[in-house]
Amino acid sequence: MTLRDNPVKATLAGGGRAFGAMVFEFFTPGLPQLCVNAGAEFALFDMEHTGLGFETLKTQCALCRGLGIVPMARVPRSEYHFIARALDVGALGVMVPMVGTADEAAHIVSCARYPPQGRRGAAFGFAHDDYQGGNVPEKIAALHARTLLIAQIETVEGLRNVEAIAAVPGIDVLWLGHFDLTNSMGIPGAFDHPDYVAAVARIVAACEQAGKVAAFLATDERSARDAVARGFRMFAYGIDQLMLQEALRAGLSMLREIRR
């Protein structure tokens, strides 16, 4: 029995950077292959702000199998059934939004790990272990080792407790939720505001102090360059429906400008 590994987690653990796509709209059969063709190392499927359900997530994770791309899911919240089910259907990583305390972060880790380290219910020979048998203790160790756990810092409460959250064993990545954080701070969309700039610096410093990774969704070159300069190491690029819309708008504009 050999389980799939998680090269994104390995890259980050080795001090490298990881680049991928965050998918909000187009959960189509060809999407994972398109991401691979574009050079994405992971596909992060959003369940927080979309209608994505577990059956479709399971299909997307299956489509990623064998393509060399790591499937992950952002679940709606930190409840056990969201985290455990996302992993059971084949996600190799889970992002949890609006993590506010170290206790919540520890709860997330517990939901993702089997006893005695956690509380995840056991079901083997399913999607998450590629429908294989094998030595159960070895399988559990492999599943724990490959699972990437991401806590989003996007509230004043999360920012206030960011050092404690970063220090929780088993949390691998802190992902900056930039829009929600500015909303929570009372400065919606003010990404140049001194308080927001200081908040970002605090999140990155907490990651560096705890040996964790800071992550970010970049939508333009300016924000990407700024994040790289600050020390972020995990990136998703773009919002799929907006990228299609912008490309289509540009193409239609080009066509309308052509005259015989």
Question: Model-found features: residue ranges?
Answer:
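Expand to "…catalyze enediolate/carbanion chemistry for C-C bond making/breaking, isomerization
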Residues: 1-260
